[in-house]
């Protein structure tokens, strides 16, 4: 049976506007793959070659979300975590399917399964593929004052730049992303800086930063190995990608503007509720409760890159006129 890859809204494979991948590939549909293995040691991984439908749609999905650095981003390898390559891996696939069915029954037939990127080092992703997520992975979000609750954080597939900016480069200049299937069920909004670590009630299954346009999926530790299924590893190079200490990219060659000036300009372009969220985050930064990179992260999440870029551009132009 030929492998088939579709988009979640059942449109053409070339249409990635909604940023989601619907996986209708049968587990044994491994056409156009190399069984020579990937750079990772897990026996469950197979290397997908150019021309393989899964390889091509994942490559397109990642690059389409990389924004200004997409033209300088090179996909090196894409490896599939195959259920046909080991009893344990097969069991994880079956368990994920059972949990999908259970959540679907809970919510009238829709388990709300999405794809999300998880950023980590090569060793971290190797460990997750082999053993699953652990408290160590939860811990890095627990110590981040800007995170949306304490759990495993993933980024929607359409927001690959946000995920890529949190990757670590290895000695060969490679970065790694883990594309996972994620059972969201019914999510609830989790505010930045929240220390929530489990659903607020039995009604909810997961967390998001925004119900309508989420940039963060939060899976609680109690569900991290039942509601997240690691599916593909992507290794890539992106020389223009800039990663701050906290894991968020800055735009190349951006003109400088102080936070105080940026806050003043944002206040004329944003609604009060979003502006108040940025003000509270900025206040935490001034009190040294959060790091600079965490403030930048929150500004980008709330205001959006397009608005920030326009404000900085206008600020630069005004300075030219003044000078």
Swiss-Prot record:
Induction: By salt stress and light. InterPro entries: Poly(ADP-ribose)pol_cat_dom, RCD1/SRO1-5, RST. Residues 250-321 form the RST domain. Signal peptide: none annotated. It comes from the Eukaryota. Residues 31-257 form the PARP catalytic domain. This is Probable inactive poly [ADP-ribose] polymerase SRO2. It comes from Arabidopsis thaliana (Mouse-ear cress). The gene is SRO2.
